[in-house]
């Protein structure tokens, strides 16, 4: 069972949740809590579907905890911050995925093959 945390439950977060709920090997370990930090340690990987301006800080926090991350686009507003996040992912030996298009389609999602 792959324990999954979802940060952000707006329009896109709901689409991701609904699509990913169809994967039988996946279990959501989050709640509608205002503080996502409450469940970070319970998750194997984190999906981030928050407003764009929050991506950098939340992704960085998750990577520093050794979590695999799937972030909605854009990852960051600039190359410097994006490079920093990928360097952290490399240092902690975790995966950092960034959504491009149609990430709510279950056939195109990396977790389907446990490729994280």
Q: What residue ranges belong to the model's regions?
A:
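N-terminal Rossmann-like dinucleotide-binding module
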Residues: 1-37
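Hydrophobic/aromatic residues located in beta-strands of well-ordered beta-sheets
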Residues: 26-28, 69, 96
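Local beta-strand N-terminus motif with an aromatic residue
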Residues: 26, 43-46, 116
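Short, well-ordered alpha-helical microsegments
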Residues: 13, 55-56, 107-108
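Beta-loop-alpha module in the N-terminal Rossmann-like domain of NAD(P)-dependent dehydrogenases
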Residues: 34-86
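A contiguous active-site-proximal alpha/beta segment in oxidoreductase catalytic domains
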Residues: 76-116
């Amino acid at each position: 069972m792959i324990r999954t945390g979802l940060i952000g439950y707006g329009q896109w977060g709901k689409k991701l949740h609904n699509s990913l709920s169809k994967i039988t090997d996946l279990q959501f370990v989050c709640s509608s809590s205002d503080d996502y930090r409450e469940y970070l340690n319970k998750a194997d990987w984190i999906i981030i579907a928050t407003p764009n301006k929050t991506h950098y800080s939340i992704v960085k926090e998750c990577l520093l905890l050794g979590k695999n991350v799937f972030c909605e686009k854009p990852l960051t507003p600039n190359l410097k911050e994006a490079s920093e996040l990928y360097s952290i992912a490399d240092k902690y030996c975790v995966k950092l995925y960034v959504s491009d298009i149609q990430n709510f389609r279950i056939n195109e999602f990396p977790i389907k093959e446990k490729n994280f």
